[in-house]
Amino acid sequence: MPLSRLLINNFRNLQAIDLELSPDFNFIVGHNGSGKTSLLEAIFYLGHGRSFKSHISNRIIHHHAENFVLHSKIDETQHQWSVGLQKNRAGDTLLKINGEDGKKIADLAHLLPMQVITPEGLTLLNGGPSYRRAFLDWGLFHQHLEFYSYWANLKRLLKQRNAALPQVKSYSELKAWDIELVRLAHLVTKMRTEYAEALRPEIEKTCRFFLPELPIRVSFHQGWENGADYADVLRQGFERDQNIGYTMVGPQKADFRFKANGLPVEDVLSRGQLKLLMCALRLAQGEYLVTQKKRQCLFLIDDFASELDPMKRELLAHRLRETGSQVFVTAITAEQLNQMHWQEYAQDKLFHLKEGKLKT
């Protein structure tokens, strides 16, 4: 579901931006500090209620303002949505969808599935397991409406269990938490396992397209020993958990691992190859969403030319075209985009930014 219009007020150095957007490729060009990344960040914020760069609102609001405002129109074949989000320095958020208050960020996220490809996004591969769990859970959030409530309740119960650990004297005092925790852990793990297995061939196929020289293999690890009953694991690990102050094993420790030639990819691949692999993962997941749910996914790509040679850039552009998705790409100059042959497509749009303002 593409954005047809985007208005940004007082978001970082973007004080007043009004864009009529293409449903295909939108290129944002400008020198460092012009606001290119901030524009992508604003779109991301509109779809997630948070930034991919900072969790501190005061760093995002323009220094002369008390709040920032984001507004967009979202077009689908038979529907149109109007979305507005405002955040002030106290951290209060006002969200409206089609003029209605009381909406949740989850409602907005369901409306705007998006994938982000940035230089910092390599943490998906060389960061901790939490980044890869988030990758899986993004897909499940958009595939299964019930997943969000399972996941949120699981997090709540784990937090309560961890808080109770230093206060209880015996395991029997934790059983009330663990009965429900085990149920939710099995539900979340079953959904993650099935989704990971369904996504695996799509990822491996896309990896062969970008990295034919390296066989990439993916595997899901549930967070405790395969075949073991999680209820027994919790009971047997009570003293250990109590000593360290948190629940050591479970779905909160799950991982989705990537290997090349039998070794972790972060130990084998160059930065350029890691970036290609990250692109392949994001593309495969976005394409899988289109196939399974008939829903388009937005792609936000920052610093497009970084660490990719011209041939790989053209390959990425070609695959993005094939998805039929709306794409936002930043680059320092239009020349960096020439490898994509974007001039051939009449619906594409090019925007020039300078010091937070659109150049006309």
Swiss-Prot record:
Record-linked Pfam families: SMC_N
GO terms for cellular component: cytoplasm
Q: Name one GO biological process term.
A: DNA synthesis involved in DNA repair
What molecular function does GO assign, one term? single-stranded DNA binding
Cell compartments where the protein resides: Cytoplasm
Gene transcribed to yield this protein: recF
Query: Which sites bind ATP?
Result: G30, H31, N32, G33, S34, G35, K36, T37
Give UniProt keywords alphabetically. ATP-binding, Cytoplasm, DNA damage, DNA repair, DNA replication, DNA-binding, Nucleotide-binding, SOS response
Protein name (record): DNA replication and repair protein RecF
Looking at the keywords, is DNA repair present? yes
Where it mainly occurs, coarsely classed, is cytoplasm
